[in-house]
């Protein structure tokens, strides 16, 4: 009889626990983790993806500004994150360098071998470019990258990643036979300051960078077509198609809807008007997908 009451007591306790903590019973799906790189555009796209996935009822974790390309890629392959925004040029020239992939289909097949899938292009090409102050370029009559060959004493300031990547400075120099020796690797913000002060004359920039207009820069024509297309895409783990197929479906809603002018506008709001990236993402989804999202006011503690 005593044993009977103990069993009844345990059953009642289990029912109470299940009613108080229903999530612990039903949350068998591992949480979805989204990453982004340490620059504004990647952070904004990560916010857009996060809000979009939340609209499915999932509660993804957004790990913003994790690091550079290798950090994000390795985390994706290892399963430490499930999704992050990337560019086709970075995939072919850096991540899969040496595998001889160039077309979108070749990239897609190579990624699948790593257990990774890729959406179609989101709608804008954020290629690398070389920029100069417009006034300096006009004074020297520099219109295209090959014109730099006539000015060996010009000083260049390139981002550290550009100094090392497959289509970066070493390859650019070889493609155009550029004679410049005074080339420094530095942070992008310092490069812009160098342009303003006149201590450097050319920098690498992204073609959707909001600071192009702000600093009145001239984008030099890539007349030898050195830089590949950097079409924005979303990379995600192949196992998401079985784990959470509705998440993969909603990711594809971003295909072909973020145009270059729209991305420049979003970058400008973040970098020049200091609008929080999550507010920008929320506005974009409302305007383009009629999706209302919960905007939270970011604080210093919110970034920790």
Mark where each language-model region is.
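Soluble extramembrane regions of membrane proteins in the secretory/endomembrane system
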Residues: 176, 206-208, 236-237, 249, ...
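A bilobed periplasmic-binding-protein/Venus flytrap-type ligand-binding module shared by bacterial periplasmic
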Residues: 127-138, 231-244
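N-terminal hydrophobic or amphipathic helices and topogenic motifs
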Residues: 2-5, 9-61, 65-67, 263-304
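Alpha-to-beta junction loops
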Residues: 77-86, 152-155, 171, 190, ...
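Extracytoplasmic
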Residues: 29, 67, 78, 113, ...
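Beta->alpha turn/N-cap motifs
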Residues: 65-69, 79-92, 103, 133, ...
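Ligand-binding "clamshell"
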Residues: 95-119, 199, 211-225
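Bilobed "Venus flytrap"/periplasmic-binding protein-like clamshell domains
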Residues: 31-61, 123-193, 275, 279
